[in-house]
Amino acid sequence: MSSERAQFASEVAEVERWWKSPRFARVNRPYTAADVVSKRGTIKINYPSDVQGKKLWKLLSEHAKNGTPSHTYGALDPVQVTKMAKYLETVYVSGWQSSSTASSSNEPGPDLADYPSNTVPNKVEHLFMAQLFHDRKQREARSRMSDAELANTPVIDYLRPIVADADTGHGGLTAVMKLTKMFVEKGAAGIHIEDQAPGTKKCGHMAGKVLVPIQEHINRLVAIRLQYDIMGVENLVVARTDSEAATLITSNIDDRDHPFIQGSTNPSLPPLNNVMVEAEAQGKTGDQLQAIEDGWIKAANLQLFPQALAQALANEGASRSTVEKLVARVSRLSWSQAVAVAQKEFGLKQVPYWNWDAPRTREGYYRYQGGTECAIHRANAFAPYADLLWMETKKPILAQAKEFAAGVHAVHPGQWLAYNLSPSFNWKLLPQRQDMQAYVWELGKLGFVWQFITLAGLHSNAYISDLFAQNFAKTGMKAYVELVQSREREIGCDVLTHQKWSGADYADSLIKTVTGGVSSTAAMGAGVTESQFTSKL
């Protein structure tokens, strides 16, 4: 065996040993270690995000064992990241926030993932570089402290693992892999990716969401894992499903999607698209076209195929219990499997008219009926390829979270779950508002080990900016002193002394190291106005 072959075989064996570690006990890979090694370069690169990924895994493992959650929110900038570091264990980077405030094209917009694909990775880098800087700054400051000062000054872990929004992957499988590579290089400990179609992606709390087939999303998850393996990192991947509220799907090619695709049960109707094309040719527009589509949908009596089979069996005289058994039996089967079961096991004589092509939209999408059962079905399919599962929801209903957790854990015991504590919900209107404080921890008991408010950084920024601007316009510096400076002092916010927070002492230390310990141009020397904050006012 040549030395090159021997080196290749040795690296393959090393990867195989790596995959047998507890870290990957739940992970399924449809490729071999040799596939991975053959796609690596000859220079081994160590990525800081790998350290962060391992840290995140250890953190969530402890929470899973204890039935507790790690909760966080979406950070906008280095200021928020350093404040979060004092109290929270992780940092979230939101695609929604990046779309509105940090697009790499500098063109803001809603959360449609129509910004350049490097937008969120760039925001991750922005925040991760700040984390690294403040970690260095703290270490230098502590090196100058006495033993007593060290004992009385808590260490802040600025290197909180970052989990970032990968949207739908921004394209095909190689686009997903390139996006994953960017996230690893920029410092993300983990990413999440959703099962929507790229060109029609919407915020999870918008209408008009279009799903991709189950296998297509599994391929994305596998692509992410393969990219991680090629880079030799243990970063995490969160599989999100938007199927709870989805109404469309791109294709019926995957048998596992069949039970949730709707079809017309009215054989007298022509296909919807034909009707709409004819109406447009007649000069119909806007509300007129919408009324025509609404009328067609109503007349079509859209049903899921198991429902259509159940009605047909009932019409043939089957008992209610027999019909219920049929529905239970075919509820997760493909169209052809469901027909075979209905005929052979339940004696169905006539397969009912049910046409899933007739209601297709002008874009060619199939009508889809989402819901919690659908989300459980998809999540269970994604579980072998992901570290955490996340069901996007319309409302934060604890009973629904329990149903989802139970449905997943019945198939995948101990599977880690994630939960979006979304600001898109009007929390004050919810029935469990009296248990608001307990909500996060109740979810933790169900296995939702990682939870996050996607846009809390945006909303907290908006709140204080609006409040301060209103009052500053009326009362001038009185507003700044009362709303900002005094409050910073009261809560111990270190940005009160913003020169020190920004690293001026650290920069002086660098300069003095170069010049032998003396500098007449030190930023924090005599004359710096920040010394006023050490005086009694």
UniProtKB/Swiss-Prot annotation:
<dbReference type="GO" id="GO:0004451">
    <property type="term" value="F:isocitrate lyase activity"/>
</dbReference>
<feature type="short sequence motif" description="Microbody targeting signal">
    <location>
        <begin position="535"/>
        <end position="537"/>
    </location>
</feature>
<comment type="function">
    <text>Catalyzes the formation of succinate and glyoxylate from isocitrate, a key step of the glyoxylate cycle, which operates as an anaplerotic route for replenishing the tricarboxylic acid cycle. Required for growth on ethanol or acetate, but dispensable when fermentable carbon sources are available. Also acts on 2-methylisocitrate.</text>
</comment>
<feature type="binding site">
    <location>
        <position position="454"/>
    </location>
    <ligand>
        <name>substrate</name>
    </ligand>
</feature>
<protein>
    <recommendedName>
        <fullName>Isocitrate lyase</fullName>
        <ecNumber>4.1.3.1</ecNumber>
        <ecNumber>4.1.3.30</ecNumber>
    </recommendedName>
</protein>
<keyword id="KW-0479">Metal-binding</keyword>
<keyword id="KW-0460">Magnesium</keyword>
<feature type="binding site">
    <location>
        <position position="240"/>
    </location>
    <ligand>
        <name>substrate</name>
    </ligand>
</feature>
<keyword id="KW-0330">Glyoxysome</keyword>
<dbReference type="GO" id="GO:0009514">
    <property type="term" value="C:glyoxysome"/>
</dbReference>
<comment type="pathway">
    <text>Carbohydrate metabolism; glyoxylate cycle; (S)-malate from isocitrate: step 1/2.</text>
</comment>
<dbReference type="InterPro" id="IPR040442">
    <property type="entry name" value="Pyrv_kinase-like_dom_sf"/>
</dbReference>
<dbReference type="GO" id="GO:0046872">
    <property type="term" value="F:metal ion binding"/>
</dbReference>
<dbReference type="InterPro" id="IPR015813">
    <property type="entry name" value="Pyrv/PenolPyrv_kinase-like_dom"/>
</dbReference>
<keyword id="KW-0576">Peroxisome</keyword>
<feature type="binding site">
    <location>
        <begin position="204"/>
        <end position="205"/>
    </location>
    <ligand>
        <name>substrate</name>
    </ligand>
</feature>
<dbReference type="GO" id="GO:0006099">
    <property type="term" value="P:tricarboxylic acid cycle"/>
</dbReference>
<keyword id="KW-0456">Lyase</keyword>
<feature type="binding site">
    <location>
        <position position="165"/>
    </location>
    <ligand>
        <name>Mg(2+)</name>
    </ligand>
</feature>
<dbReference type="InterPro" id="IPR006254">
    <property type="entry name" value="Isocitrate_lyase"/>
</dbReference>
<comment type="similarity">
    <text>Belongs to the isocitrate lyase/PEP mutase superfamily. Isocitrate lyase family.</text>
</comment>
<dbReference type="GO" id="GO:0006097">
    <property type="term" value="P:glyoxylate cycle"/>
</dbReference>
<feature type="binding site">
    <location>
        <begin position="94"/>
        <end position="96"/>
    </location>
    <ligand>
        <name>substrate</name>
    </ligand>
</feature>
<keyword id="KW-0329">Glyoxylate bypass</keyword>
<comment type="subunit">
    <text>Homotetramer.</text>
</comment>
<dbReference type="GO" id="GO:0046421">
    <property type="term" value="F:methylisocitrate lyase activity"/>
</dbReference>
<feature type="binding site">
    <location>
        <begin position="420"/>
        <end position="424"/>
    </location>
    <ligand>
        <name>substrate</name>
    </ligand>
</feature>
<dbReference type="InterPro" id="IPR039556">
    <property type="entry name" value="ICL/PEPM"/>
</dbReference>
<dbReference type="InterPro" id="IPR018523">
    <property type="entry name" value="Isocitrate_lyase_ph_CS"/>
</dbReference>
<dbReference type="Pfam" id="PF00463">
    <property type="entry name" value="ICL"/>
</dbReference>
<keyword id="KW-0816">Tricarboxylic acid cycle</keyword>
<feature type="active site" description="Proton acceptor">
    <location>
        <position position="203"/>
    </location>
</feature>
